[in-house]
Amino acid sequence: MPGVASGQGTISVPNAYGDYYFGKNKVQFENFKWKIYHSPHFDIYYYTEDEELLQKVVSYAESAYDQLSQEFDFQIKKPTSLIFYETHAHFEQNNEISNFIPEGIGAFATPVRFRMFLPVDMSDPELYELILHELTHIFQYHMLFGGNLGKGIAGRPPVWVMEGMASYMEGEESARDKMFVRDAVVNDQVPPITQAGVGGFFAYRFGYSVFEYMEYRWGPEGMRDFIVELRNTVGGRVGRAIERAFGISPEEFDADFRRWLRKRYLAELLETGEPGDFGRPFRAHRGIRAQNTSPVASPSGDFVAAFTNNRGDVDVVLYETKDRTFFKNLTKGYASDYQYLVAQELTMGRNMGRDIAFSPDGNSVAFFARKNRGRELVILDVIKKKIRHSVEMDVGQQFSPAWSPDGNSIAFSGWLDGRYDIFEIDTQTGDIVNLTDDDVYDGAPTYAPDGESIVLTSVVGGYQKLFRI
């Protein structure tokens, strides 16, 4: 799911990729020629020449407005400004936030002039959810603060209220989203609702569960009653709003909420088991907690390459499969060669597929790295820890590389002409071919063992489906 800015103008994203990039300089490469499109409820600022893309954004924004206005029983009197960018690389160049914006931050909304800023290089379902999320913040600013920024700063509802409500309005949680709350339930670490310090990505998931529980117990009007009482409570005190909306104390709410969570997740845990029941974890260093993502086994099966953030930087490391121990860091010292590695859940939001690929002989790995205005394909010698090739492309937002069995090609997903397709690059000549060239969102390519076909994931009708080309 995408990271977003909170109602206070501060950005709440998973700690794995949030704080690391703040303070870094923002560089503007393009000079966009902005135009304005007026729809019933929006002033939409755009520069794209793709009329179909513009109309899609307009349609999604108006549909999201209709959905939220009915849910909240509230109308916004003036048009909302929506500024959209064709890609995240373009979105990073906005003038609203002075700091560099990492790819883990998907969009943001501001309470000053009720404006939404977002990129649109994603699948249609994700784009609609993103617009729903940011527009929920706009509704919050109007409903809770009455358009009064001073009141919003003074009230300052907890992050979980602002982000949890916006996440809840998006719709169903993913399995990964549920994992955060399930882990808190199993380890008895569910915080009280009056605890203001709940932040990071957990604030999104915790808040989602709170609003889900409200609707489960008090129906759709429960959330509306809570919003009304929170607006009328001095200082945005959640506990007082709970008492007025539901007639129970915050302590009673917490107890019932925890009981509901335990019934939901502990039964699920008994059915599925714990991670340790299925295997031993890979650890870079004993006693140090770190995230490891995009694991891929070497052709021999002796090693696993993965992204890790155990030393602050995000690196590609090798683990020995036999004893699950750290073997070596492949990218240590390469910070000056690129801005960061393209690693889902670490430097960017979750998408699909893996972000590392082994060559058939096991001597090289391929991944994408951010450099200047775009991404480059990096081919790294595993033995010498040296970059063999670094390839710039006209294709943008590349991710999920896959190496062909003969070693001559690398397939990947990338953005070109307003959509994501599967591309293939010749590792010797650098020539690139668009393999799909269709109107759906394509990602996660994988070569068949004989190299004669590629299996990929396409988002069709809101669902991810497998295809072979």
Tell me what each language-model feature is:
Residues 305-311, 320, 354-357, 366-372, ...:
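Beta-strand C-termini and the immediately following turn/loop, strongest in propeller blades
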Residues 100-138, 142-285:
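Acidic/His/Gly-enriched intrinsically disordered linker/tail segments
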Residues 294, 355, 400-402, 444:
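Conserved beta-strand position repeated once per blade in WD40 beta-propeller domains
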Residues 8-158, 175-177, 195, 237, ...:
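Juxtacatalytic substrate-recognition/specificity segment
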